[in-house]
Structures are given as C-alpha cells and as structure tokens.
C-alpha cells in the first residue's frame, strides 16, 4: 500500500517480516546473507521480499521446522490486515558470494532496529497520523553496495526531521553512508 495512505492500517512490511525470521535464525544458528531484497518504491510499503542465505547443511531440517512455525505464527499475526500473506522457503544453488558474518550481523540488526510505521498521532486532528516512517526498499546493487530506502512523513517539520535522524542513526551505527533527499 501507499505509505501515506496505508501506514495507519497496520499493513505488514515484507522486509520487516522476512528480516525478523532471518534475525532469529542468525541469533540461533548463525547464517550468512548472500542477498536480501524487497520493496521497490520509496512511497510504498514493501509488499514482497526475498533473501538467499547460507548456513551449515546440518541445520537444514531445523531451519525448515523453524520456518514452518514462523510462517504459521505470521499468518496468525497478520490474518486481519494481510489475509493473503504468503511465506515460502526453497533450496537454491550455493551462491558465489555472501556477506561476511560481521556484515550479516550488522545488516540484520539495522533492519530489525529500523523504525517502521506510525511514530505519532496528531493531537490537533484526532485519528490522523502526524508522523510516520517507511522502510521502503532494500536492494543489493553493484560494487558491493546495499541501497536501503526509507521515507518519512509528518505534518510537523521538526518531527519529520526527528524521525529521519532516528532512522539515519540506526544505519550510521553500522557504518553506512546516509543521504537525505
């Protein structure tokens, strides 16, 4: 959905839903991310996301069981606002390149910590969102670059800057370059 129109409807963000699972797997077993992509428009809530991960072969069945449990949990969590939620797990060929363990940890932690959704409701207009932030897209692009796009909205300029700075701080903690546009 459009981040300005739908941010207050409790819609799921595919990047956040996927990253939550990957973060948990990484905490329990350790994994390496080869790719993680989702979303495509700055002003839209991410509807799709996918990742390729690498882990020890002996963990394959554990991860499959964990995935099935997570998928069932997410279907329950999102059954009202995302009744068509689909989560899929499949085996793929071993990728040629993966992120280091250190950078996998940083990326998954930053995406987990990145705020998304309604930050504040308006006191002047009850029922209206005052300030929100959207984790819009994650793209692995050339030259070992990961582009993470977010957007912030507010009817109070200082609050828009506040939430934009909060998002920037999350990514600066992992050494990312941050640009405001």
Could you describe each region identified by the protein language model?
Residues 1-153:
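Midchain, well-structured core segments that form catalytic/ion-binding scaffolds
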Residues 158-177:
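Redox- and metal-dependent alpha/beta enzyme cores, enriched for Fe-S-associated oxidoreductases
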Residues 179-181:
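Short acidic alpha-helical/loop segments enriched in Asp/Glu that coordinate divalent cations
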